[in-house]
Curated annotation (Swiss-Prot):
Subunit structure: Heterooligomer composed of large and small subunits.
Keyword Transferase found: no
Record's keyword terms, sorted: Cytoplasm, Exonuclease, Hydrolase, Nuclease
E.C. number: 3.1.11.6
Subcellular location: Cytoplasm
Top enzyme class: hydrolase
Originating organism: Lacticaseibacillus paracasei (strain ATCC 334 / BCRC 17002 / CCUG 31169 / CIP 107868 / KCTC 3260 / NRRL B-441)
Protein name: Exodeoxyribonuclease 7 large subunit
Function in brief: Bidirectionally degrades single-stranded DNA into large acid-insoluble oligonucleotides, which are then degraded further into small acid-soluble oligonucleotides.
Reactions that this protein is recorded to catalyse: Exonucleolytic cleavage in either 5'- to 3'- or 3'- to 5'-direction to yield nucleoside 5'-phosphates
GO aspect biological process, one term: DNA catabolic process
Molecular function as annotated in GO: exodeoxyribonuclease VII activity; nucleic acid binding
Length: 449
């Protein structure tokens, strides 16, 4: 029989185990890798679990340590953790006190995703592509794996909704290191060919590593350069990629993507055409009916029932013009008859002879008066000319010189008129009636003025 003193209380055992945990150097600082689980962000200390495929451990990160984490924790994020193992006495559970935490694997990818997302958003690329899709597309390009369920779902949906749409598959690698380059190559090929109304790019679900090619910057920029609307259908509805932000539309599934590019089904289109046909027929019927009413009203109008009234006033005006024309012609003929009678009377022979004699006398008298006037004018002009010649002769410099006067010039022929024009030692020329005399200035003396 075991002594009662050998039984330990739960508290005692828990305290003992806690001391063991705290004293064990291997548990004082442990390095773990795991996936975050049961995480819900709180104010202050953070509680969550770390798990792998076979085990799970509770974790606690105090406020001071958590404030140093530069990224947001998310459910399922793989992390590298440094901490110590301790036992929580009230519940008897051991847990990890996390002192340092950083992303690992998917966590690192998530951090890269956030960085690229912020970069592209700052460039305004997420708000750039908001182009509308055509109601009745003719050609749509699909960039995806040729063997996956994505293309099958798209083809099935299009065949059901809008079978006249031409789908063109551009097969691409959608997972792995070569996927991003393959996607960019196919997008550039679509842009070069041209003529497509829209592009669907996508793949099925998977881990973040599987979906990572659709988070590559080169793929995002290739999508930005596409000249037609882009529909993204990557992963499941809960998955979000950079491609989703860049695309004009995001579809949760390949079926939804096919529905987006075929907004109007063929049946809807045919029904709409039928409705438009009915509206067109009704509109034409109404127009014809209205036209018939107008024709009937026109047939009953005065213009058609009494057409003579249209040109009554013109007939009256023609009559007035005719009367005025006849009166004008009558007056002109009467005046012509009068002038003819006058001319005839003036052509009488005796009257003509008398007129000729009178004209001859008039011409003779005019000629005599003209001769007298011409002789008087010539005599007057001759006298005036002789007087002018005599006056000019008296004013001639030669006449003046002939009376003993002279004029003086310098070597250049400039006339020297006053004392100021002369210079001492200057050679001058004195002009007289029959020649000139050279002289030299030796003195200057002002006599008056």
């Amino acid at each position: 029989m075991v002594d009662a003193s050998q039984y330990l209380s739960v508290t005692a055992l828990t305290q003992y185990l806690k001391r063991k945990f705290d004293a064990d150097p291997y548990l004082a600082k442990v390095y773990l890798t795991g996936e975050i689980s049961n995480y819900r962000k709180r104010v202050g200390n953070q509680y969550f679990s770390l798990k792998d495929d076979h085990a799970k451990i509770g974790a606690l990160m105090f406020r001071n340590a958590f404030s140093k984490v530069q990224f947001d924790l998310e459910e399922g994020m793989k992390v590298l953790v440094v901490g110590r193992v301790s036992l929580y006495e009230p519940s008897g559970e051991y847990r990890l006190i996390v002192e340092h935490l950083e992303p690992d694997g998917v966590g690192a990818l998530y951090q890269a995703f956030e960085q690229l997302k912020k970069k592209l958003a700052a460039e305004g690329l997420f708000d750039r592509n908001q182009r509308p899709l055509p109601l009745f597309p003719k050609r749509v390009a699909v960039v995806t794996s040729p063997s996956g369920a994505v293309i099958q779902d798209i083809m099935t949906t299009v065949a059901r909704r809008y079978p006249i749409l031409q789908l063109t598959l551009f097969p691409a690698v959608v997972q792995g290191d070569q996927a991003a380059d393959s996607l960019v190559k196919r997008l550039n090929q679509i842009k070069t060919i041209g003529g497509f109304d829209a592009v669907i790019i996508g793949r099925g679900g998977g881990s973040i590593e599987d979906l990572w090619p659709f988070n590559e910057e080169k793929v995002a920029r290739a999508l930005v350069d596409m000249p037609m609307p882009v529909v993204s259908s990557v992963g499941h509805e809960t998955d979000t990629t950079i491609t989703d932000f860049i695309a004009d539309r995001r579809a949760a599934t390949p079926t939804a993507a096919a529905e987006i590019v075929t907004p109007v089904t063929l049946i809807d289109a045919l029904n709409r055409i039928s409705e438009d046909r009915v509206r067109l027929v009704n509109a034409m019927h109404n127009r014809l009916k209205n036209a018939a009413i107008r024709v009937q009203r026109s047939a009953q109008s005065v213009v058609l029932t009494q057409p003579d009234r249209l040109y009554d006033q013109y007939v009256q005006r023609v009559d007035q013009f005719q009367q005025r024309l006849q009166q004008s012609m009558h007056n002109r003929l009467r005046d012509a008859d009068h002038r003819l009678a006058m001319a005839t009377s003036q052509l009488d022979g005796r009257q003509l002879f008398i007129r000729l004699v009178n004209l001859q006398r008039q011409v003779t008298g005019d000629r005599h008066r003209l001769d007298q006037a011409m002789r008087g004018l010539v005599k007057t002009k001759r006298q005036a000319f002789a007087s002018a010649v005599s006056g000019l002769d008296h004013l001639s410099p030669l006449k003046i010189l002939g009376r003993g006067f002279a004029y003086v010039t310098d070597k250049q022929g400039q006339m020297l008129k006053s004392l100021s024009d002369y210079e001492l030692d200057q050679d001058i020329h004195i002009h007289v009636a029959d020649g000139q005399v050279g002289a030299h200035v030796t003195t200057k003396e002002k006599t008056h003025g």
